[in-house]
């Protein structure tokens, strides 16, 4: 395919402009044709993708009448003389508002401009109140870890706008809600750690009583968005500018949990109660459906009360994947039910839960994953709060844009509209269903389905969502456009901007429908990178409910069917198998997905698996591909700078340095000779400047990779034969193992990997054999 590179550039430009990548860029015209695609029609959409030239309009959008509510966009037919526009989604004729009376072909409003496929509206309605941050701190920690945690939170106060509201809850054996509005001395309300509390009980115990909600019409003060918090709630949740001194004092004087811990016991931690009370505090203070983040800092697992994941006896280990497989799980089901119920409550309120784990052992991310996954919260897994990985990742949560606004949205919702050719089958990402049924909701379900609208709660510029579609019927041209029929989809994202205003981001995407059955345009429109990421999200979604081997079989079956459908071959002749250029990388993406930590749980704790899957479901195409198939660069004397090499054991050479990027780890690996020279100190001697430069080059490139990455990756420097080299060896295609012969054409210098895993070549041989035989 001669123009493959040009098409790739076009898809990349669309991603930069609209934050959208589609698995197929031409849609089949019938359901029958669609069923033969194997890979579903899907879009990976990043609603808040940062883009300097996205117009920000300071007025309400022009919308179609209910129930459609489609927004005026460049694909609408507009009758300038009659001041009428036709909605492409429901084909209704709508009158343009009076202030559009002067529009003409030469003078069109920004939202109708052909380049305005993505546009943002700053809605006149302010948010009910400023964003809220509730810090929930575990005090059962070593002194140095607790001090580092307190310092990082004190630092974060300076990154928050003065009008942002803050609250503080600490927990150990008991949970304490701190009354920041009381300035005479430190004052807190204590809740028992072994009992769950309803919102009513929280309200009564902290003396909030029945309170009035903020008045809907309350106008924002200059520099203070939204209304102020209700008076009684001001005792616990206050603007940073008002309580920073008091909050800093309380944080600085925080001590380790005083409850004694025997040598053979774990500290008693009531994480579940602390989170439940945090949610209850927001509900009792009448902050429902306002932007709020509950930020949990856990230094260990919950060992007491509802949500406990392990008992206090150290001789009782926390559950492993093996225990879960054998159903040897004492607390898992009960804890999971507790946190899932809490997640439902929190997401209904529009609040976000972030989980920061600072512990070498597991803290219960597996049980708590629903809290972050359904509310768009962050999940950060580190060894300790003293680590730079935690400190820098936490600081990056508060990144700001050019106007000094926090790069985060609150209380977000997304709706997807489509023309009659398409129906929405579901979404995979950090969201919950809003159970909105409409004519464009599909019969089948993929991910969170049976709806065309979802609630995200938390949203940021990297947050990406996989949205899946099906073809509605037997096709036929759209009633909208002359010429080649087009299918149109519109993404509407409503969210509370950190400045306190409500915003609406609108992205409208149009793609051609294919011609008669067998149209080559379909195959040529396949974006293998987007398809690999969309399929990996489905695989991970399945892995949450199905057995691991079943998911791997599903991945294999889909790949064989895709190759059978789109490869060129003579039946039963594997040597004749050939894939077009825009399909060639797809099998190797699937090979690495099968071996990845997303589907293989061996050597990972359940908490790590939950963390890795959480991040995959948050990132865009580029970052997700790095996670699925890491990048490997080689540095040697025979070329300047890094040179991309195959992710293969044959790439390990004694006289090179390798830089591996798995997204979660950045690793610099020195070949045997390089490591010996470095240990001998040649780089510090005169005349070996080129060796010094060679050693520095991968470090500089690693710095660039780490620069904007969130969460901060673990940085590893290792040598051939060193224990840390396992991070590299586990990712490489094992083309040179202890089973391949030394005279089999493989360079003697390549690394031997001791594994029974099949190599990419063997995998491809089997794939070709099965694809040409028509076996699926």
UniProtKB/Swiss-Prot annotation:
Give the record's GO biological process terms. Answer: COPII-coated vesicle cargo loading; intracellular protein transport
Q: Which InterPro entries match?
A: ADF-H/Gelsolin-like_dom_sf (IPR029006), Gelsolin-like_dom (IPR007123), Gelsolin-like_dom_sf (IPR036180), Sec23 (IPR037364), Sec23/24_helical_dom (IPR006900), Sec23/24_helical_dom_sf (IPR036175), Sec23/24_trunk_dom (IPR006896), Sec23_24_beta_S (IPR012990)
One GO CC annotation, please? endoplasmic reticulum membrane
Q: Which domain of life is it from?
A: Eukaryota
CDD domains assigned: Sec23-like, Sec23_C
Keyword field: Cytoplasm, Cytoplasmic vesicle, Endoplasmic reticulum, ER-Golgi transport, Golgi apparatus, Membrane, Metal-binding, Protein transport, Transport, Zinc
Q: Which family does it belong to?
A: Belongs to the SEC23/SEC24 family. SEC23 subfamily.
Q: What is this protein called?
A: Protein transport protein SEC23
Organismal lineage: Eukaryota, Fungi, Dikarya, Ascomycota, Pezizomycotina
| Record gene name | SEC23
């Amino acid at each position: 395919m001669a123009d493959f590179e040009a098409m790739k550039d076009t898809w990349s430009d669309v991603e930069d402009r609209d934050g959208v990548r589609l698995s197929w860029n031409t849609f089949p015209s019938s359901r029958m044709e669609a069923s033969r695609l194997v890979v579903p029609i899907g879009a990976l959409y990043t609603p808040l993708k940062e883009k300097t030239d996205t117009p920000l309009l300071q007025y309400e959008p022009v919308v179609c009448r209910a129930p459609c509510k489609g927004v005026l966009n460049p694909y609408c037919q507009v009758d300038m003389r009659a001041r009428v526009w036709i909605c492409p989604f429901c084909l209704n004729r709508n009158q343009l508002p009076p202030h559009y009376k002067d529009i003409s072909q030469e003078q069109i409003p920004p939202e109708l401009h052909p380049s305005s496929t993505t546009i943002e509206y700053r809605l006149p309605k302010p948010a009910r109140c400023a964003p809220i941050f509730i810090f929930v701190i575990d005090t059962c920690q070593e002194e140095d870890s607790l001090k580092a945690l307190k310092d990082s939170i004190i630092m974060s106060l300076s990154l928050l706008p003065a009008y942002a509201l803050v609250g503080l809850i600490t927990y150990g054996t008991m949970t304490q809600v701190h009354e920041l509005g009381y300035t005479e001395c430190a004052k807190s309300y204590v809740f028992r750690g072994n009992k769950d509390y309803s919102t009513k009980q929280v309200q009564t115990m902290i003396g909030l009583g029945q309170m009035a909600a903020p008045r809907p019409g309350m106008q924002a003060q200059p520099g203070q968005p939204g209304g102020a918090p209700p008076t009684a709630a001001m005792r616990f949740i206050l603007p940073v500018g008002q309580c920073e001194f008091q909050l800093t004092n309380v944080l600085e004087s925080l001590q380790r949990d005083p409850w004694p811990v025997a040598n053979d016991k774990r500290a008693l931690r009531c994480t579940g109660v602390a989170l439940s009370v945090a949610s209850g505090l927001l509900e009792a203070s009448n902050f429902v459906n306002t932007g709020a983040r509950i930020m949990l800092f856990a230094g260990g697992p919950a060992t007491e009360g509802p949500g406990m994941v392990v008992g206090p006896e150290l001789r009782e280990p926390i559950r492993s994947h093996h225990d879960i497989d054998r159903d040897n799980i004492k607390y898992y089901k009960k804890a999971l039910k507790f946190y899932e119920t809490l997640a439902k409550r929190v997401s209904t309120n529009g609040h976000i839960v972030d989980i920061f784990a600072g512990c070498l052992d597991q803290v219960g991310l597996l049980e708590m994953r629903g809290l972050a996954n359904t509310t768009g919260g962050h999940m950060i897994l580190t060894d300790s709060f003293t680590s730079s990985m935690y400190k820098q990742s936490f600081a990056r949560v508060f990144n700001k844009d050019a106007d000094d606004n926090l790069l985060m949205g609150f209380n977000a919702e997304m709706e997807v509209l489509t023309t009659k050719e398409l129906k929405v089958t579901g979404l995979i990402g950090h969201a919950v269903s809003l159970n909105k049924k409409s004519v464009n909701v599909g019969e089948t379900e993929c991910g969170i389905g049976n709806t065309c609208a979802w609630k995200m709660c938390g949203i940021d510029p990297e947050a990406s969502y996989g949205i899946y579609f099906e073809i509605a019927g037997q096709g036929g041209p759209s009633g909208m456009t002359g010429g080649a029929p087009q299918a149109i989809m519109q993404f509407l994202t409503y969210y509370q901007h950190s400045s306190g205003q409500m915003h609406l981001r609108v992205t409208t995407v149009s793609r051609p429908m294919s011609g008669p059955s067998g149209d080559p345009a379909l195959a040529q429109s396949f974006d293998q990178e987007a398809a690999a990421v969309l399929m990996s999200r489905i695989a991970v979604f399945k892995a949450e409910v199905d057995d691991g081997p079943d998911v791997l079989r599903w991945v294999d079956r889909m790949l064989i069917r895709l190759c059978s459908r789109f490869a060129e071959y003579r039946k039963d002749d594997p040597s004749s198998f050939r894939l077009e250029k825009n399909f060639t990388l797809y099998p190797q993406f699937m090979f690495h997905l099968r071996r990845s930590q997303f589907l293989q749980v061996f050597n990972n704790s359940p908490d790590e698996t939950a963390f890795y899957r959480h991040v995959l479901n948050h990132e865009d195409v580029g970052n997700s591909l790095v996670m699925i198939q890491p990048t490997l660069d080689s540095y040697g004397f025979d070329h300047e700078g890094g040179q991309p090499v195959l992710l293969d054991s044959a790439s390990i050479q004694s006289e090179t340095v390798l830089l591996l990027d798995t997204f979660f780890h950045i690793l610099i690996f020195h070949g045997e000779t390089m490591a010996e020279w470095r240990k001998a100190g040649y780089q510090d001697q005169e005349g070996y400047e080129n060796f010094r430069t060679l050693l520095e080059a991968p470090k500089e490139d690693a710095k660039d990779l780490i620069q904007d990455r969130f969460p901060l990756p673990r940085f590893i420097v290792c040598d051939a034969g060193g224990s840390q080299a396992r991070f590299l060896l586990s990712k490489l295609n094992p083309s040179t193992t202890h089973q391949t012969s030394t005279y089999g054409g493989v360079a003697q210098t390549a690394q031997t990997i001791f594994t029974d895993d099949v190599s990419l070549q063997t995998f491809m041989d089997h794939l070709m054999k099965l694809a040409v035989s028509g076996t699926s």
